[in-house]
From Swiss-Prot:
Keywords: Cell inner membrane, Cell membrane, Ion transport, Membrane, NAD, Sodium, Sodium transport, Translocase, Transmembrane, Transmembrane helix, Transport, Ubiquinone. Belongs to the NqrDE/RnfAE family. Its main location: membrane. One of its GO terms (cellular component) is plasma membrane. Composed of six subunits; NqrA, NqrB, NqrC, NqrD, NqrE and NqrF. One of its GO terms (biological process) is sodium ion transport. InterPro entries: NqrD (IPR011292), NqrDE/RnfAE (IPR003667). This is Na(+)-translocating NADH-quinone reductase subunit D. GO terms for molecular function: oxidoreductase activity, acting on NAD(P)H, quinone or similar compound as acceptor. It is found in: Cell inner membrane.
Length: 210
């Protein structure tokens, strides 16, 4: 397999074949909290992808010099440093979105996807493959967030990226926003539906009967 094919596989596999939310069931809490708007889902995707990619790369660079007894602490220190950078950049340039994301940017530090890839992949792999793996898993996470955020904002408020798409009753149109879509349980339903759709096309992901 060529280098280009390896890169493509590393980036695309976490989107559908091994999605961190849909298959591994990681990072679900933030998926419920930040998907009421497509804008916040998109920014959270960028933030997690940035942190996952660079933390993977950084951990991989020093993996042979990290004592086994403190490896988790070192990984968390690297992840926390990157999260602080992301948080400060959002506060400086996207303050309104930063307020909407609230504590969930800081909680990227404990996101199972970020920590899991650092421990399971970056500690055992070279820097460049680790960087690509981080990008792929960030995009896999973002695929679910953006899909859920699209439907929640569209049907919950009749808007996308804050712009009216469905003519609202309050503005003389025909669409009455569905308030349920703005509540966290709707994200559970949508994620469940998305998992079902993925498994219809990829039946190998269905768990074997006990």
């Amino acid at each position: 397999m060529s280098s280009a094919q390896n890169i493509k596989k590393s980036i695309m596999a976490p989107v559908l074949d091994n999605n961190p939310i849909a298959l591994q069931v990681l990072g679900v809490c933030s998926a419920l909290a930040v998907t009421t708007k497509l804008e916040t889902a998109f920014v959270m995707t960028l933030a997690v992808t940035f942190v996952t990619a660079l933390s993977n790369f950084s951990v991989s660079l020093i993996r042979n010099h990290i004592p086994n007894s403190v490896r988790i602490i070192v990984q968390m220190a690297i992840i926390a440093s990157l999260v602080i950078v992301v948080d400060q950049v959002l506060k400086a340039y996207l303050y309104d979105i930063s307020k909407q994301l609230s504590v969930f940017v800081g909680l990227i530090i404990t996101n199972c996807i970020v920590m899991g890839r650092a421990e399971a992949f970056a500690m055992k792999s070279a820097p460049v493959p680790s960087l690509i793996d981080g990008i792929g898993n960030g995009l896999g996470y973002g695929f679910v967030l953006i899909t859920v955020g699209f439907f929640r904002e569209l049907f919950g408020s009749g808007k996308l990226f804050g712009m009216e798409v469905l003519p609202l009753v309050s503005n003389g149109g025909w669409y009455q926003p569905n308030g349920l879509m703005l509540l966290a349980p709707s994200a559970f339903f949508l994620i469940g539906f998305l998992i079902w759709v993925i498994r219809v096309f990829k039946p190998e992901q269905v768990e074997a009967k006990e």
